């Protein structure tokens, strides 16, 4: 289910403050966050956000196509080892 439009997007307050401060100062620093549920806003474009996947931080460079998606979509939590198949001898 998607979030109600009258509520607006969820963005972690501390994460948003850090990105806005970087926009004002012009610095490009990797920001670590555990907030996978935060929506990517247009202010995030051009910055790198390190998103926690439960084990380590995955660096995510934000582009214009990512606006409106959530940060957790770009940091997979499970490793795909492949399907069971015929083992070649």
From Swiss-Prot:
Keywords: Ribonucleoprotein, Ribosomal protein, RNA-binding, rRNA-binding. GO terms for molecular function: rRNA binding; structural constituent of ribosome. The keyword rRNA-binding applies. One of its GO terms (cellular component) is small ribosomal subunit. It holds the Pfam family Ribosomal_S19. The keyword Plastid does not apply. GO terms for biological process: ribosomal small subunit assembly; translation. Protein S19 forms a complex with S13 that binds strongly to the 16S ribosomal RNA. Belongs to the universal ribosomal protein uS19 family. HAMAP family: Ribosomal_uS19. This is Small ribosomal subunit protein uS19. It comes from Bacteroides fragilis (strain ATCC 25285 / DSM 2151 / CCUG 4856 / JCM 11019 / LMG 10263 / NCTC 9343 / Onslow / VPI 2553 / EN-2).
């Amino acid at each position: 289910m998607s979030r109600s439009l009258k509520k607006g997007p969820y963005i972690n307050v501390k994460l948003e403050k850090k990105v806005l401060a970087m926009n004002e100062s012009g610095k490009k620093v990797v920001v670590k966050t555990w907030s996978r549920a935060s929506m990517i806003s247009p202010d995030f474009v051009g910055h790198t956000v390190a998103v926690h996947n439960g084990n380590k931080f995955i660096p995510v460079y934000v582009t214009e196509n990512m606006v409106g998606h959530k940060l957790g979509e770009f940091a997979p939590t499970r490793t795909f080892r492949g399907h069971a198949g015929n083992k070649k001898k």
